C-alpha cells in the first residue's frame, strides 16, 4: 500500500521533509494542529498543555501498550495562523535530542490543502536513527487519522 505522506531524506543531510496533501480546507488543517481536542483525536495522545501562540509551549503524553507513559514537549517560535508554525520537539527521557520543525500550511483549492514539515536534527546520525524507527508508517497513520477526524467535523 502506498503511503500518502511522503518523506524525503537526502543521504548525508541532517534534515528531512515530510509532505501530505489533504482533502481538507486550509483552515481546518491548521485547526487540527492547534485545538487540543482535535490534536488528541488524531495523534492518539493526551494534550497536557498547548499554547498556540508565538513563544507558547506544548506538552503531550502518550501511553504505550504496556502502560508506560511517554512525554513530548516543545516551544513555538513562529506562529502565523493558517500559514506557519515553527517549533522545537523533544521526546522527554530519551537519548533523542531536540529537533527543530518548520510546519507550513498551504491552500491548494477551496477544499484541499498541503502540509510541509521540514525537520532539522542535531546531526545526520540523529536523523538516521529516527528513520530506523517505524517513523514513515507512524506519521502516515497519524495523517490518515487527521483526515478521518476532520471528515467527521466537516459533516
Where are these regions (language model features)?
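Hydrophobic ligand-binding cavity/cleft-lining segments
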Residues: 1-46
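Hydrophobic pocket/interface hotspot
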Residues: 29-30, 39, 58-60, 76, ...
Amino acid at each position: 500500500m502506498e503511503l500518502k505522506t511522503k518523506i524525503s531524506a537526502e543521504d548525508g543531510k541532517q534534515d528531512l521533509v515530510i509532505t501530505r496533501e489533504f482533502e481538507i480546507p486550509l483552515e481546518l488543517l491548521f485547526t487540527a494542529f492547534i485545538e487540543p481536542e482535535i490534536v488528541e483525536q488524531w495523534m492518539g495522545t493526551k494534550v497536557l498543555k498547548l499554547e498556540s501562540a508565538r513563544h507558547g509551549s506544548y506538552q503531550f503524553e502518550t501511553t504505550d501498550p504496556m502502560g508506560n507513559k511517554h512525554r513530548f514537549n516543545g516551544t513555538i517560535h513562529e506562529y502565523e495562523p493558517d500559514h506557519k508554525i515553527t517549533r522545537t520537539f523533544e521526546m522527554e527521557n530519551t537519548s533523542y535530542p531536540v529537533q527543530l520543525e518548520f510546519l507550513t500550511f498551504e491552500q491548494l483549492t477551496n477544499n484541499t490543502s498541503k502540509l510541509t514539515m521540514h525537520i532539522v536534527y542535531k546531526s545526520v546520525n540523529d536523523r538516521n536513527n529516527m528513520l530506523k524507527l517505524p517513523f514513515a508508517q507512524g506519521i502516515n497513520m497519524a495523517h490518515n487519522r487527521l483526515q478521518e477526524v476532520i471528515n467527521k467535523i466537516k459533516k
